[in-house]
Amino acid sequence: MRLLTLTEYCLLIFFTGFYLAVTGFTAKDIGLYIGIALIYIFSHIFSKRLLEKRGKENKQVHLFFSVLAIIGSVFITVLCIALVASFSK
């Protein structure tokens, strides 16, 4: 897997989790699709610019580290949502 793709996936997981949490998991139809599309577009642009500056956009990442990064992204997303929810009460 390319580092650019992995970075996009991790950012997409993180910000989509927050988007769904902020909308109360009630986003439906066109609002859900537009929100996820905008999150993907912004995460793609950010990832591409970040990795182009460092010259690492085509670097390959091993499968094990890809799986760890995606699992870590899910864990951090759930942890942040839980922390924000616990402090808001």
Curated annotation (Swiss-Prot):
What GO cellular component is one of the record's annotations?
plasma membrane
What domain of life does the native source organism fall in?
A: Bacteria
Q: How does it sit in the membrane?
A: Multi-pass membrane protein
Transmembrane segment boundaries: 5-27, 32-51, 63-85
Q: Provide the protein's localization.
A: Cell membrane
Q: Which UniProt keywords apply?
A: Cell membrane, Membrane, Transmembrane, Transmembrane helix
Supply the name of the protein: Uncharacterized protein YkoA
Species per Swiss-Prot/TrEMBL record: Bacillus subtilis (strain 168)
